[in-house]
Amino acid sequence: MRSNRAKSRAVVSMAATLPMLAGALALGIPAAHAADNPGRDSLAGTKPAWATAKADKGATSNGSQVSLRVYLAGKDASGLAAYAKAVSDPNSAAYGKYLSAKQVQARFGATKAQVAAVKSWLTSTGLKVTGVTQHYVSVTGDVAAAEKAFSTQLHNYAKGAKTYRAPSKSASAPDSLNGAVLTVTGLDNAPHKANHDDQLPGPTAVFKNAGPFSSYYGSKTATSLPSAYGKKIPYAVQGYTGKQLRAAYGAGKYTGKGVRVAITDAYASPTIAFDAATYAKKHGDAKWKTGQLHQVLPGNYTNTGADECDASGWYGEETLDVEAVHAVAPDADVTYVGGASCFDDDLLDSLSKVVDNHLADIVSNSWGDIEANQTPDLAAAYDQVFQLGAVEGIGFYFSSGDNGDEVAHTGVKQVDTPANSAWVTAVGGTSLAVGKGDKYLWETGWGTEKASLSADGKSWTAFPGAFTSGAGGGTSKTVSEPYYQKGVVPNALATANNAAGNRVVPDISAIADPNTGFKVGQTQTQADGSESYSEYRIGGTSLASPVIAAVQALAQEARGGKAIGFANPSIYAKYGSKAYHDVTDNPTGSGLAVARVDFANGYDATDGLLTSVRSLGKDSSLSAVKGYDDVTGVGTPADGYVQSFVKPKGHR
């Protein structure tokens, strides 16, 4: 279940494409002088691709109000990107030479003089400064003042069935600021939110799984149901536990001791401490120590309604993330950083809190949106935070999405964001088979096709059925191919959208299929209106991301506690080794499927049962093949992965 940075962002025109994030923006560098506007520096990417002449519906009223964030470039934006790369590259002399948060701010942050100059410019145009952080200056005002400040005209544009405001040309800033401005967000008012990637309903109402179940893969065969792929198939597992996942991914003796993991989502579950403690006790996980689970929360929440961000729907996301990390890395410290809403500005604030205060070395993020909805100005703001984190030795892990190639969901083949950033680790998903005695059997790329049981119970209707969900992946249309993917990612994938090569997602993977999912425990509203703790099986790349974050905590412990930092160069350096399970869609040589029984009403048998067959390894147009692929990346952690971080005796 992955939290989408915005359910309502699906109203965008799916035909929209974004300019390539190359050169200045890709590195977080302020754009060059505007040739058509002397004395101004263009802020590239501030005019959305959907703001076309054909869609133009006329000028926005001068009196309309705007709320903007002017992001600061800092003293040395190009130097920040270069240092972030060097400190993360195992082949660099600077590898692992991280800076403290204070050192990062002193070396790369905006100076007091830069901030003062930006504030002076903004107020001189009639905008009102409403807040200042080390990353941005927030302002409000009317359209006329914004147009004056950024030397552009704001028009209304048709975007799908909606109308939104946007600049008619790229915004700019005075060149007298000497590049102090990175970008500005808020000139366009299309929704910028995230969705969580859960595959099951949120905790507002109870959800329970019906049986029969397998306790491990294949333990209970559906003998009374029709065959699939020429054989009887097992019932879906009840939900794997931490013990099974630790065995599958080679945890060994490591527990994440001494390692700090952060989780970002929107809002905060009011019952997380109780739920996490109850779950750990019921499933044999280590008891949470006093102070081991922290929460860093905003003073106020916004956009909480069901038609906005649906705050309660995010509670299950936090629950899954916290319980999954603790199940796999039971001694790691966990800090949950909640956003004030599911909008990008608030999620960026959460990420910045982690970096500015170095709350953790490993950050799991189970939320995102489609690439067509991310504008380059936001991408620049995100990348700046990711680069600052890399310099401190902080790595960010993002779920790759739950809709496969997104065609069934949006009508357009595309990847998700921020997982598409070259500065984060995109985590894809698999279907996992753990057998008797916690033995790893196999994995497939996660992609599900569903067919229902016929009325007479003798066949599966229209077998194998329709695509329901699967790991997000594919080739970005906006992000250039990063150096660490060259030589590993097949050329056919890298050049799918551009002969010069683009970023391909994901980088690495873990369990995600809800049909081979993880059991979680959460306080839910029961059918009678009471609230009580109950458990259910869940999946999505929302599960894969915290599992990989937890495995990274084990790896960091194995290397003596030294931060792994931005992990992609290291992940690709281990490609083709015993560190990974090389996942394919057909690991057993024949079709794979499980039988699943669900309550029709989602919680009990009052309204009957629904029986279906779920075929595995059917991820839309994406395929898990031998070697790197766009479903699972380099693969999943094998027994050799954590062990590969152990330094030989005598090695310093």
Q: What are these model-derived regions, one by one?
A:
Residues 1-35:
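Secretory targeting and sorting signals
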Residues 8, 556-627:
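An often Trp-containing, charged/polar helix-loop segment at the C-terminal end
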Residues 35-131, 138, 143-429, 469, ...:
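Substrate-binding/charge-relay-adjacent region of secreted/lumenal peptidase catalytic domains
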Residues 114, 544, 599-603:
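Helix N-cap / loop-to-helix initiation motif
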Residues 314, 367, 442-448, 456, ...:
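Tryptophan-centered motif/residue detector
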Residues 420-477:
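Polar, glycine-rich mid-to-C-terminal structural blocks
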Residues 544-545, 577:
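Long, domain-scale functional regions
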Residues 549-557:
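Short glycine/serine- and small hydrophobic-enriched flexible loop segments
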